[in-house]
Amino acid sequence: MIKSGFITIIGRPNVGKSTLLNSIMGEKLSIVSCKPQTTRNSIQTILTRDDFQLIFVDTPGIHKPKHKLGNYMVKVAESSVKDVDLILFLITPDVEVGKGDRYILEQLKKENIPVFLVVNKIDENPQEKVAQTLKNYSEIFDFAEIIPISALKQKNVKELVELMVKYMPEGPKYYPDDMITDKQEKFVVSEIIREKALRLLSKEVPHGIAVDILSMKKNSKGLYNIEATILCEKESHKGIIIGKKGAMLKKISTYAREDIEKFLDSKVYLEVWVKVKKEWRDSDRLLKELGYK
């Protein structure tokens, strides 16, 4: 028997949930962007060592839904706090305790699950601000541990992992040693492309994009041929994504290919198109096809 269990990361949009998960794993498995609510699926990632296995559930930021996709994202976030062994409540020092935070913490009091207060981005805020934030939150909830970190610079991340292991029950290895995610390769590839698009595009094209992997085949020489379509909701968005003389689409494809090659540990030929699908975020059929339901 080893130490093994399930952990969920929750918090406001854009507090660094995906960055923290990637920092812990050393792999870019969860989409990272400067835009809120960029994580859509509850991605399970697995960190395995000789004496422990931690299974992370990365959730969308809990927010007021505006469409069916938003409803799905909130449902995933709320369901992810059930049946786990530990909850990481992630915050940043620059944001005051709000009604939403109090609501979530009130719900967590009912769960009888240990909760860590993880304060991210401490390198971007004065020590006095960090200390005050810790005090404010500790007054409204009895956290099992309080850990200030910088996920981006990996400050105190190793110490956080050690503390998480300490709180895990004894159990089996739920996944093979070499498995780092329970999602199919296609899903991770689509998320990489979507991340690059979100990172490079302006605010004119917010969350109204998805990536559909049309084909993903490996030839006899070990080269992956991948065909993908970026779906957007408006013709004007299509033009922005493609860019002048195709420059933006080429940039998205190039950056995505580099990360996909690292993930697959193989050379990749990537071809990406752009297609308009009006109101795809409210289409049950499309959401199901894209793996969001």
Curated annotation (Swiss-Prot):
UniProt xrefs under Gene3D superfamilies = 3.30.300.20, P-loop containing nucleotide triphosphate hydrolases
Whether Kinase counts among this entry's keywords is: no
Region G2: list its residue ranges: 37-41
What Gene Ontology terms for biological process does this UniProt record contain? ribosomal small subunit assembly
GO cellular component terms listed in the entry, alphabetical order? cytosol; plasma membrane
For binding GTP, which residues are annotated in this chain's numbering? 11-18, 58-62, 120-123
- What job does this protein perform? An essential GTPase that binds both GDP and GTP, with rapid nucleotide exchange. Plays a role in 16S rRNA processing and 30S ribosomal subunit biogenesis and possibly also in cell cycle regulation and energy metabolism.
Q: How does it assemble?
A: Monomer.
* PANTHER family referenced in this protein's UniProt entry, alphabetically: GTPASE ERA (PTHR42698), GTPASE ERA, MITOCHONDRIAL (PTHR42698:SF1)
Similarity field: Belongs to the TRAFAC class TrmE-Era-EngA-EngB-Septin-like GTPase superfamily. Era GTPase family.
Task: Indicate what this protein is called per its UniProt record.
Answer: GTPase Era
Source species: Clostridium kluyveri (strain ATCC 8527 / DSM 555 / NBRC 12016 / NCIMB 10680 / K1)
Question: Upper lineage ranks?
Answer: Bacteria, Bacillati, Bacillota, Clostridia, Eubacteriales
